[in-house]
Amino acid sequence: MLILAVLIGAGMALVEPVKGLIRQKYSNDAIAVAESAIIQGEGTITFEVPASPALAIPGEEGEEDTGLDKLIRDMKELSGEHESLTLLGILEIPCIDVKEPIWDTCSANALRYGVGRYPGTSNIGEPGLCNLFGHRQIGNLDAKLGSIQYLQEHIGEEVIVTTTDGTMHIYKIVKTVYVKDADLMPYLDPKTYDEETLCITACGWGKDPVTGKTYPMNTEFIVICQPASED
């Protein structure tokens, strides 16, 4: 019985890393498809990703069930239904080694495989505020924006967004802020800024790795970027 318990425990410990690798594979495949579209200037394209709840990010749906039944169900569901998502381009933040596909939605499923444009905010490259959301889940190997809080040490660094029509948009980081969910609305309104502004948003709760300050649940970390000058 002890050996069986050890084997079960070891198997369960491997589940999240395996799921992370699967999610990352689809993210990488989406980047490859976007890069091909960029070269050819294809414009907006679609890409299929798994829609199975088996690939949910830890904490996405509340407390995780870690029982053996859950493990077996998850493994059976991995080949289930897929969803077609609109792929807008690629987000790159060189100073923290981020390169992720950008989806035209912030659905839970889309954010498992990249970052998403918040519905109703400006389109990339247009006047007003465009907000890209992503996960900063603690302890996940495939956290899309796992190092985002370090950008408070990189004011002035470049953020690059290349859309699938082949257009490269280069921004500079101008500011980072922590915002409570209750105060988030200005960062979801395209009219908050008249000029073109890119925000990148992820959860901000927990201990800040730079300042050491601890932030409560329902807090977001936002990076505010504006177009780099051409001179």
Residue ranges and their predicted role:
Residues 2-231:
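Solvent-exposed, non-transmembrane regions of membrane-associated and secreted proteins
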